[in-house]
């Protein structure tokens, strides 16, 4: 039997088993590190010689049980690991493992488990979330650094591409985005990002690597403050760059709907426009919630007879005439007062995208929400 723990910047790999198995896993990890080092040198023009990166990793291998079991604490009740997970095509994605947390631990709510950890009625001890905005390889999405994020695809086409990777793979869900946003708020590390044409609007020195002929930046190319916990190992680019799909929340004819808990992660959950996977978002007493838009003002309430229009404003100017732990778990509230809230409550269906884009300035952010987006839309600013 053998054990190994490899660390490379924010990426780690742990393996335990027969020596041959552990050796193969270590070799695969070191091969990825070498490729990453070469990509970094090529894309960043780094002066530092990274050719000996595998040797650096070898020197960091830890074989004692205590070190292997140790995990980094990121917030009360929340832990994560960074791991490489391979899909059915044999290509890795860099993923965070988040461990189960309750609403009480996360934002002072009830003792209920956060909905991101409840899938198909089963409570999971852990879930995995992409570290990077996804890029496309042979029609499948992957979480990899220093890549161009995928755009010009509809949410449903993107979701199906994710499901095609094999069991467990899925598009980022609204419940999972809520977990990330609530965790950032709890930590006091609301992420910065590409909000001003490859720079952060709050400090022009914070910038990512710009993609030629665009204002988008390569995935994970910004500083540590561009992650959910302000560490190099955090989840990147939740603020700005491109709007991101958050599958499982919509507004239809002014009413708010969501997939139950994190069932948007399941391919069998029917989230077509008339699908039975949609459930009303409710207040603390179980009343369905609606969004009224009148005179460029947005109000969340329980009244079905609402004024229907469309507009956008800062979350700090949104009226919340309801008490809903579900909205809090989904991070649909003024966690960032300047972040934008855009709503279309007119007739029809509009799905949720989040985070803001490269030109949204202070209106971008992990709490920025856009319920203004028909499911048939595809464009260069979201994906």
Question: What do the PLM-derived regions correspond to, one by one?
Answer:
Residues 59, 63, 178, 203-207, ...:
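C-terminal, surface-exposed recognition/capping segments
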Residues 112-238, 242, 269, 382:
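Short aromatic-cysteine micro-motif
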Residues 50, 54-57, 73, 159, ...:
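Interface-prone segments of viral and bacterial extracellular assemblies
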Residues 22-24, 252-255:
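A short local loop/turn or secondary-structure capping micro-motif enriched for an aromatic residue
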Residues 78-168, 253-300, 382:
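Extracellular adhesion/carbohydrate-recognition regions
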Residues 1-57:
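Compositionally biased, non-globular sequence tracts
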Residues 54-80:
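Charged, compositionally biased non-catalytic regions
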Residues 185-190, 250, 259-261:
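Short secondary-structure boundary/capping segments
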């Amino acid at each position: 039997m053998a054990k190994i723990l490899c660390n490379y910047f924010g990426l780690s790999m742990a393996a335990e088993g027969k020596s041959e198995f552990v050796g193969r896993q270590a070799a695969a990890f070191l091969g990825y590190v070498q490729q990453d080092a070469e990509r970094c040198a090529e894309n960043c023009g780094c002066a530092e010689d990274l050719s000996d990166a595998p040797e650096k990793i070898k020197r960091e291998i830890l074989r004692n049980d205590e070190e292997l079991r140790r995990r980094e604490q990121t917030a009360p009740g929340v832990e994560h690991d960074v791991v490489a997970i391979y899909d059915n095509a044999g290509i890795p994605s860099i993923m965070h493992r988040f461990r189960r947390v309750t609403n009480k631990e996360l934002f002072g709510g009830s003792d209920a488990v956060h909905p991101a950890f409840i899938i198909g009625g089963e409570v999971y001890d852990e879930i995995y979330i992409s570290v990077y905005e996804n890029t496309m390889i042979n029609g499948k999405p992957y979480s990899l650094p220093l890549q161009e994020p995928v755009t010009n695809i509809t949410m449903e086409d993107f979701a199906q591409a994710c499901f095609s990777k094999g069991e467990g793979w899925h598009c980022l869900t609204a419940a999972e985005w809520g977990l990330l946003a609530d965790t950032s708020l709890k930590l006091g590390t609301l992420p910065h990002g590409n909000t001003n044409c490859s720079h952060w609007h709050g400090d022009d020195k914070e910038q990512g690597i710009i993609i030629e002929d665009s204002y988008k930046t390569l995935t994970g190319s910004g500083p540590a403050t561009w992650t959910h916990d302000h560490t190099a190992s955090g989840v990147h680019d939740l603020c700005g760059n491109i709007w991101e799909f958050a599958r499982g929340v919509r507004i239809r004819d002014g009413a708010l709907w969501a997939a139950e808990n994190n069932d948007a992660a399941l391919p069998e959950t029917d989230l077509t426009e008339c699908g039975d996977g949609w459930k009303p978002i409710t207040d603390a007493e179980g009343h369905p919630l609606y969004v009224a838009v009148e005179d460029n003002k947005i109000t969340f309430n329980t009244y079905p007879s609402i004024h229907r229009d469309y507009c956008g404003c800062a979350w700090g100017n949104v009226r919340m005439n309801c008490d809903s732990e579900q909205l809090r778990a989904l991070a649909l509230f003024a966690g960032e007062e300047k972040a934008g809230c855009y709503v279309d409550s007119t007739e029809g269906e509009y799905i949720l995208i989040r985070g803001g884009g490269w030109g949204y300035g202070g209106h971008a952010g992990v709490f920025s929400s856009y319920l203004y987006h028909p499911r048939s839309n595809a464009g260069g600013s979201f994906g």
